[in-house]
Structures are given as structure tokens and as C-alpha cells.
Amino acid sequence: MNIFDELKERGLVFQTTDEDALRKALEEGSVSYYTGYDPTADSLHLGHLVAILTSRRLQLAGHKPYALVGGATGLIGDPSFKDVERSLQTKKTVVSWGNKIRGQLSNFLEFETGDNKAVLVNNYDWFSNISFIDFLRDVGKYFTVNYMMSKESVKKRIETGISYTEFAYQIMQGYDFYELNKNYNVTLQIGGSDQWGNMTAGTELIRRKSNGVSHVMTVPLITDSTGKKFGKSEGNAVWLDADKTSPYEMYQFWLNVMDADAVRFLKIFTFLSLKEIEDIRIQFEEAPHQRLAQKTLAREVVTLVHGEKAYKEAVNITEQLFAGNIKGLSVKELKQGLRGVPNYHVQTEDNLNIIDLLVTSGVVNSKRQAREDVSNGAIYINGDRIQDLEYTISENDKLENEITVIRRGKKKYFVLNFK
């Protein structure tokens, strides 16, 4: 199976400019292609992973990737299917975010070895050297306002208002493709389906300005089986940066994917062969309660993003927390596993009697409730049940002299911080 047909089989081809021509190009030799990443945050997230992994699949098939960091376009903001205009960031912020994105991309693409090693480019390099007058004369003249207004991404903003800054974004992205086509013989652009209008602006500019060959392929914006936009946990983005979304949190995210989505996501987010995925599907449908598809997803993606050590750590945290074995984990692991639970910073003057502390730290609302919970065996300190109403937190309860973990009932965790 050629690479284009495999991408289709995996559900990774949403739209192309000319499917037959693109398939033929990918079959006949090495194609140089690019994907753009605007630094709109200090990390990429799961939503970016579809295009990143598609880029990696093409590289493994012998094609040459160019990763474009939008140092210039990141200063403008893409209006595509956004309800309101993005906040403009400072140059310093965009440069900082761009550097972090470079580091993350190197985890997925091969930049060091091989004839088709990836190349990193920044569109600030060419936009900073072109004057506004030259841009209007040499680029703007190829775009009619009617053409620009016809883009769905613009149409949706006309009623609420769109600034000229954002309106011009599609020309800038189109010029990126032209620059890469002219200087690096890049003939394919890959991006999310919401980018179609901006991407075809590039093929139009290449056709009109140089009569060059160019293709566009979009990957789908992933939604779950309920139609909900994929890549968020509790309304928050799942980031590729371990400091923003820990490996444990990412592991839990994949572990909790719905049955109806699990096999489809294996095709999109892992490098398991289609035959391996089909075998998993059969086993999964025979025993869905064992959650083989979700466990495989969690293993493959966390290992891919954070490495095998982080994956094993996430599994261990999951198992120990499920068993209530707090002392089986390091403070570092506990902070991963309990990120997001209520925290209380203990002051030196605080009364460390269990009843007073439960109220002060917000575990319970009243001393009466605290006494009731302790008497009934509902309170655990570092995994040990406490039923002594006079119990006082001691140095022995401070894990690594830093935290104490309180559990109320089976699942409600609270962390006391002593630093």
C-alpha cells in the first residue's frame, strides 16, 4: 500500500486539491512538503499531533518535511473559524514560544540524519525583509478582494467584524507556500481542515506568480463520537509539554477515551500497523471491559510524546493511587498524580490536630463533620486510616519533608504542602 492510500485508510486525508496528481507525485519520488505552526502558546497540544504525526509518516516513507514556525504570522493571528480576534502577542513572546515549539517538533521529526532529514524554517526571515509597498505590489496584486471574501474562514467573521490585520493573514500564509516552493521546491502543504482557505491561497499564488506545481492536503479536525472537539480534558487543552500536562494526566486522558473512538484513534495517533490495529479491534470487541484499545492508545501515545520511562511512571502512579498506596510513590510522582486536587499550604502557626486541620484545609466544613469522618474511618493520612480524634500531624507524616496526602472516602484527595 502506498503512503497516500495508507493515510486515507487511517482517516487522515480530509481534502486535497487533486487527489490523483498528489498520489502520483508521492509514488514517483521524494516530495518536499511543509506544515506550519504559529506560536500562539508556549506549547503544542493534541490538536497539533494529527498533522505532526502525518508529517512523520510521510518522512518515514521517504519524503522530506519542512517545519515552518510562524514567527511573522504568529504576530498577526489566524482568523480561521475563530469567533473573535486573537489577542496580539509581543515579538519577545512569539520568539520564546517559537523556540519551545522547535524543541517539541524535534521529538517527532528526524532533523539530524538522512537525505530527507527535516528542515526548520521561520517565516519571519522573509517577511522581515519585505516592505509593505513591495508586498502589496508583488503579492497583493494576485489576490482579488472577491476571492479573499469567498473563503469560509472569512465569511464567518464578516458579520461580527474582522480587522484588516486578520483579513490579510491568508495572503501571508499563501506567500509562505510560494517562498518555500521557489527556494526549497516544496510542492505540498499539510494542515488542518480549517486551514483549507489559507492553504489554497498558496496554490493560487504559486500558479499565478510562477506557474509552479503545488498540492494541498488537509487532515481532519478530530472530534469524538459525540461530535465534541477532541484534545481537551475537563475543558482544558491536553498539552505536549510535560510541565503543562503531565505524562500521568495524558495517560489518563487516553485511558478514558470512549469505546466508540478507541480503534479509530489507534489509526490516527499511533504507528502500529493496520494489521496490528485490526487484531486489537477483534480482541477489544470480544472483551471491551478489558479496555485493550484504550490501554494500547495510552501506552503508544505517552511513550511517543514523553518516552517509555514517563509511560511506566504513569502506569505505576495509576496502580498505586488505585490501591491507595501513597507511600509507594515519590513526592514527584504524587505531584503528577494529584495535580489539580485541592492544595493547602500549611503555615507554621497552624494547629496540626487532625480535627482542626481538616477544617482549616477545607477537607470538611465543620468540626462536627471532621469528628464524624474520623470516627467512621473515612479519613486517611498517606494511605493509613486515622480514627484517633486526638491525632496530630507529625514529622513522620511529611513525605520527603514536603507534603502530606489526605484522603476522604475512596477518591477525594487533598494535599498539605509544608514548603
Swiss-Prot record:
- Where is the motif named 'KMSKS' region mapped on this chain? 229-233
Instruction: Decide whether keyword NAD is in the record.
Output: no
Q: Which GO terms describe its molecular function?
A: ATP binding; RNA binding; tyrosine-tRNA ligase activity
Q: Where is the S4 RNA-binding domain?
A: 352-419
Q: Which Gene3D superfamilies match?
A: HUPs, RNA-binding S4 domain, Tyrosyl-Transfer RNA Synthetase
Q: Domain of life, per the record?
A: Bacteria
Quote the SMART domains the UniProt record gives: S4 (SM00363)
Task: Spell out the disulfide connections.
Answer: none
Where is the secretion signal located?
Answer: none
* Quaternary assembly: Homodimer.
General function of this protein: Catalyzes the attachment of tyrosine to tRNA(Tyr) in a two-step reaction: tyrosine is first activated by ATP to form Tyr-AMP and then transferred to the acceptor end of tRNA(Tyr).
- Name the chain's protein: Tyrosine--tRNA ligase
Organism per entry: Streptococcus agalactiae serotype V (strain ATCC BAA-611 / 2603 V/R)
- What are the top taxonomic ranks of the organism? Bacteria, Bacillati, Bacillota, Bacilli, Lactobacillales
The encoding gene:
tyrS
